[in-house]
Amino acid sequence: GDIQGVNHGLASLLQLIMTAKDAQLPVLTIQDKPAFGYRGLMLDCARHFWTVDELKETLDHMAFFKLNTLHMHLTDNQAWRLSMDKYPDLVKEGTYYYDFPELSGKYYSKEDLKEIVTYAGTRGIEIIPEVDLPGHCIACRIA
């Protein structure tokens, strides 16, 4: 066992306690292992921006349910959410919503992504960033 196995064991124990009558558990032996290596979800951060705090809360929930992969869809026709030093207009122009200006200008800096990856890593979760090219690139072309 590694630390992730310990974390998963503690999550199983907490889940049992939460559902046990009067928080009492019988003496038991648990044999638990995942059926699949990839246990994750995908968030469309391009069309529906998630703040760093919202992502951290999601990562906490993922860890509780023993998920190990978060696929972040960072670019699409509607917005480019990935800051790139060489192309600053991608987040300046590529995040503008003409129909919903209050959603405009939101993106992830390099520091944001480092923070998210580090936070996820401490919970045994891998981040898969997705840049949707060559299709779905209207936001990129606008910038």
Describe the role of every protein-language-model region.
Residues G1-A143:
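Feature activates predominantly on carbohydrate-active enzymes
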